[in-house]
């Protein structure tokens, strides 16, 4: 990186000197022609031509060097917050707090797809024929719960002062590289063939992209948005696609939240964001805990991150249902998201958090609300979105 930067500076100096020399020679040519010194003028013209060719070659090299610099810069990770625990991977994340009492009932809890099948609520076989592994059909009461959770989450966030947004479900490459690292992009994003467009892996990307190349007055901050969207992911990472179930899949829906704010306010907003997710899950009677992500589990652009995990009575452990991240000014720097204040312009901070991703929520919801008779209790907060139903009854 340093060597390329040095060469880039050298090229710029060379080009500047050559252009100054060309201007000087060009002025001389006119004088030589007036003096009738045609041979000297022709020699000067040859120097101008050679000069222009050298400038063209150096300019091409400059462009190539700057592209290499940009590529390397995109791989340089953010500076993590001093409070982040040091660790090699997610096995060294640190539990922060538990909310709600984890319960393991006296009766056996089946795998989540087995519960869904009792309600004729899922068809993985047909989805496999239509789209392959990593897709599903949800039907009947299970599909209703899915939609009810999304609607409830939307209203939950609106009541907390967030502006509801339905964003584009495709974004251009400059937005993709503005919000994530190349490694994340390769593992997650589906590209539209023949187009400079990618299917979003999360609506955070298109919501943050809304502020590309903007300058927002301080008094208009923070910008707080919550959105619903389908999400599409290749899931090429270490975990891959789940062979059976809806925990890790190619297509799912999600309610997301983002904040664009002043740098000094981002720690406060970080805590508010993950607390929103905790409060939503607790309002649906699902025990959760928060984990502080260690340094080895942070994506390149993240300054600090907290995972929210829900209790699984079947597995007798917690599993991830959402992630809250403070990106500092990393995304703002790449996308040109600036703020104007009394002392001039500066980069904003951006944050994002999962409100709820219903496929994973469904797992926690069904396991924590399953009754011994096979019915699934509908928590009181969700009943208005389920036509007043207090429970769903299995059909088999």
Question: What would you call each of these model-derived segments?
Answer:
Residues 98-396:
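TRNA-recognition modules of translation machinery and tRNA-sensing kinases, especially anticodon-binding
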Residues 1-102, 117, 121:
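N-terminal alpha-helical targeting/anchoring segments
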């Amino acid at each position: 990186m340093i060597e390329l930067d040095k060469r880039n500076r050298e090229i710029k100096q060379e080009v500047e000197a050559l252009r100054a020399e060309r201007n000087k020679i060009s002025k001389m040519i006119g004088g030589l022609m007036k003096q009738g010194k045609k041979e000297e003028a022709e020699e000067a013209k040859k120097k101008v031509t050679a000069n222009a060719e050298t400038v063209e070659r150096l300019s091409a090299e400059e462009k190539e060097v700057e592209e290499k610099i940009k590529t390397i810069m995109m791989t340089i990770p953010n500076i993590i917050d001093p409070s982040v625990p040091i660790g090699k991977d997610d096995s060294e994340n640190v539990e922060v707090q538990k909310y709600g009492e984890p319960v393991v009932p006296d009766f056996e809890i089946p795998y989540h797809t087995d519960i869904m099948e009792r309600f004729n609520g899922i068809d993985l076989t047909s989805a496999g024929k239509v789209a392959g592994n990593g897709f599903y059909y949800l039907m009947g009461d299970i599909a209703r719960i899915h939609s009810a959770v999304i609607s409830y989450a939307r209203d939950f966030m609106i009541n907390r002062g967030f502006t509801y947004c339905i964003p584009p479900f495709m974004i251009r490459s400059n937005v993709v590289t503005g919000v994530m690292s190349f490694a994340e992009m390769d593992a997650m994003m589906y590209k539209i063939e023949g187009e400079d467009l990618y299917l979003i892996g999360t609506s955070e990307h298109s919501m943050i992209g809304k502020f590309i190349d903007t300058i927002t007055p301080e008094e208009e901050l923070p910008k707080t948005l919550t959105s619903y969207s389908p999400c599409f992911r290749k899931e090429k990472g270490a975990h891959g696609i789940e062979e059976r179930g809806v925990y890790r899949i190619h297509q799912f829906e999600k309610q997301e939240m983002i904040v664009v704010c002043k740098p000094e306010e981002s720690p406060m907003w970080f805590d508010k964001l993950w607390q929103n997710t905790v409060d939503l899950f607790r309002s649906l009677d699902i025990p959760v805990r928060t984990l502080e992500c260690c340094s080895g589990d942070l994506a390149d652009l993240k300054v600090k991150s907290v995972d929210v995990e829900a209790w699984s009575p079947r597995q007798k452990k917690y599993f991830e249902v959402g992630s809250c991240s403070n990106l500092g000014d990393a995304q703002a720097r790449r996308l040109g998201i600036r703020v104007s204040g009394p002392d001039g312009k500066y980069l904003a901070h951006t944050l994002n958090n999962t409100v709820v991703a219903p496929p994973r929520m469904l797992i926690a919801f069904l396991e924590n609300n399953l009754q011994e008779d096979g019915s699934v209790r509908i928590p009181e907060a969700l009943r208005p979105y389920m036509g007043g139903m207090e429970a769903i009854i299995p059909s088999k």
